[in-house]
Design a protein with these regions (language model features):
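Active-site-surrounding "flap" and adjacent substrate/cofactor-binding loops of secreted or lumenal enzymes
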Residues: 12-13, 26-96
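Extreme N-terminus nucleophile/cap motif
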Residues: 16
């Protein structure tokens, strides 16, 4: 087992290292804020992220789209040319939303108030190996990442069960 870091070794460089390991690094002011705490407080501030308010707004489209079902129903009775056009429009919309989702998530990772939570979301996202190419719907990708955010630190069985339902 690792020995706890002695108080005299806790400094700015160690705080930067901790922030790199538990998150995605941070600006000098954030590193200094951690360095000003003692080691245990710094670790606790990253681990107890549920206590930190998260003001990040969700993307505008991050909710069920009631018009999507209607668009698919309309396509059922459409001519082959109209179906192709509707399909292209839907694919274009989903590609745009997927780009927005990626930007939104990268922003959360880079500047969000809960770096460990986002690092865990990225870990679980990679572990369960879902991709935009398979899902093709930004809302469902966002929803899965929200599941990982909510359950990032719960027990494995619960996460596995919920991810299986998702």
């Amino acid at each position: 087992m690792l020995k706890p870091l002695s108080a005299d070794k806790w400094n700015y460089a160690m705080a930067a290292h901790l922030l790199n390991r538990a998150g995605f690094g941070g600006p000098p002011a954030e590193i200094q804020k951690l360095a000003d705490l003692d080691h245990d407080q710094a670790v606790a501030s990253l681990l107890d992220y549920e206590k930190i308010p998260d003001p990040t707004a969700n993307p505008d489209w991050a909710r069920p789209d009631p018009t999507r079902i209607e668009r698919f129903r309309a396509a059922k009775d459409a001519s082959p040319e109209e179906k192709r056009k509707l399909q292209q429009d839907e694919q274009r919309l989903q590609r745009q939303r997927m780009l927005e989702l990626r930007g939104w998530w990268l922003q959360r990772m880079a500047t969000g108030p809960r770096p460990l939570q986002e690092k865990l979301v990225l870990f679980w996202h990679g572990h369960f190996a879902t991709s935009a190419d398979k899902v093709r719907d930004a809302y469902y990708m966002w929803r899965q990442n929200e599941l990982f955010r909510r359950l990032a630190t719960v027990n494995w069985q619960m996460l596995l069960l919920e991810a299986g339902k998702d």
